[in-house]
Swiss-Prot record:
Residues 1-22 form the signal peptide. The basal body constitutes a major portion of the flagellar organelle and consists of four rings (L,P,S, and M) mounted on a central rod. Assembles around the rod to form the L-ring and probably protects the motor/basal body from shearing forces during rotation. It comes from the Bacteria. GO terms for biological process: bacterial-type flagellum-dependent cell motility. It comes from Pseudomonas putida (strain ATCC 47054 / DSM 6125 / CFBP 8728 / NCIMB 11950 / KT2440). HAMAP family: FlgI. This is Flagellar P-ring protein. Belongs to the FlgI family. One of its GO terms (molecular function) is structural molecule activity. It holds the Pfam family FlgI. The gene is flgI. It is found in: Periplasm; Bacterial flagellum basal body. InterPro entries: Flag_FlgI (IPR001782).
Length: 369
């Protein structure tokens, strides 16, 4: 059905005419079903230098430790529930299992304390099974932790903490034991899911694929998905997708947006943001309250007491700001230049943008995060 060599030759010829702003298909879309899977496990970190869990306050750590010893045939005497294990910490372990991971491959893992351990620095994770959402074990984790933070405390109670010492990573710390079933080789079609749904982008993908492979090979399901015909043979399917994912697509322009982070004062204005004709003036009201208490001294032989009498001064100043006008189709550069001319701070710019949106003059989505 598909001649891979002819596809490669045709793709190389077409790539010469692509615009500089075009993006590869693999950068704007993903293949349905080809995804990573989250794994999680519970285990013990040992070898800590006295920074482990206080097991009297975290009984689950001691219980886990006793269960581990019982697996090695070691019986813990009854009544030892108050044993303090300073070098052991209960941890959660999580990892992302990449698509097509096979048994024997390794993945990175993240280890985080779930008790009251002060630091995992210098610790080693004991064998920990990692399970998926279905309850099956897909990987086994074990190894020495790499911890970027540290914690130090003096005898007088002074303390310093750098970064987060209660979490660390083990590069290649988990060995894959089971592959995740994949539907990649099933059926005669594949679905491409756009990272940012857009009807224009979906149509351009369909046009590009059909121009290369023939009419009807690609069909748009909706603004976020495109279905393409694919070879049934697995090896041909891989070659086929290697060609498709390197096609250069000119994506549609993003929706005009203005993003405001009210906590940090960050404002991001998209390139396509425009403003309808409007006039803006923004003044700043400054209220100053100063305290200048005076001392009231009683007269001699009056049997009075010296008292402090509060005296407050309140002053309000309204800073005049010039008015500036936005003409029809004002662009991002003109907005920034006009606002900078009046010396508006990020907080003032937020108020101006919100007012423009309420007035219907801001031709963009205003999103506050």
């Amino acid at each position: 059905m598909f001649n891979v060599r002819q596809l490669i030759a045709t793709t190389l010829l077409l790539s010469c005419a692509f615009a500089a702003q075009a993006e590869r298909l693999k950068d704007i879309a993903s293949i349905s079903g080809v995804r990573s899977n989250q794994l999680i496990g519970y285990g013990l970190v040992v070898g800590l230098n006295g920074t482990g869990d206080q097991t009297t306050q975290t009984p689950f750590t001691l219980q886990t430790f006793n269960n581990m010893l019982s697996q090695f045939g070691i019986k813990v005497p009854a009544g030892s529930g108050n044993v303090q294990l300073k070098n052991v910490a209960a941890v959660s372990v999580h990892a992302d299992l990449p698509p097509f991971a096979k048994p024997g491959q390794v993945v990175d893992i993240t280890v985080s304390s779930i008790g009251n351990s002060k630091s995992l620095r210098g610790g080693s994770l004991l064998m920990t099974p990692l399970k998926g959402i279905d309850g099956n074990v897909y990987a086994i984790a074990q190894g020495n932790l790499v911890v970027g933070g540290f914690d130090a405390e003096g005898r007088d109670g002074s303390k310093i903490t750098v970064n987060v010492p209660s979490a660390g990573r083990i590069p290649g710390g988990a060995s894959v034991e089971r592959a995740v079933p994949s539907g990649f080789n099933q059926g005669n079609t594949l679905t491409l899911n756009l990272n940012r749904p857009d009807f224009t982008t979906a149509k351009r993908i369909v046009d590009k694929v059909n121009d290369l492979l023939g009419p009807g090979v690609a069909q748009a399901v909706d603004g976020g998905s495109v279905r393409v015909s694919a070879p049934m043979d697995p090896s041909q399917r891989v070659d086929y997708l290697s060609i498709l994912e390197n096609l250069e697509i000119d994506p549609g322009q993003a929706v005009a947006k203005v993003i405001i982070n009210s906590r940090t004062g960050t404002i991001v204005i998209g390139q396509n943001v425009k403003v309808s004709p409007a006039a803006v003036t923004h003044g700043s009201l400054t209220v100053t309250i100063t305290e200048d208490p005076i001392v009231s001294q009683p007269g001699a032989f009056s049997n009075g007491q010296t008292a402090v009498v509060p005296r407050s001064r309140v002053n309000a100043e309204q800073e005049a700001k010039p008015m500036f006008k936005f003409g029809p189709g004002t662009t991002l550069d003109e907005i920034v230049r006009a606002v900078n001319q009046v010396g508006a701070a990020p907080g003032d710019l937020m108020a101006i943008l919100e007012a423009l949106k309420q007035a219907g003059a801001l031709q963009a989505d205003l999103i506050v995060i």
